[in-house]
Amino acid sequence: GPGFEMPVMILENPSIKNLYDFQNARHRRYTLSSGACCMRFNQPGDEIQKSVNRIQSFEGELQVSEYRGRKQANFMIEKITYQ
């Protein structure tokens, strides 16, 4: 309910299948090998140049979004840790 803080989760060593930049690389969607979708909004400029192969973990929260009647779980990335 209102005021309830979502738990922060950490995905260690994510197996990234592909990524997609949108809105002039301000935002990025990572698709994991499992099919899970991870979203990074307002990514810092220095992250754009870093290799996805060096990503150690994603930190964020799980959210359910609905678009045109279709519900989808997304992991909303708040922080990326690199090796």
Q: Where are the language model's segments positioned?
A:
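Acidic, two-metal ion nucleic-acid-processing modules in DNA metabolism proteins
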Residues: G1-Q83
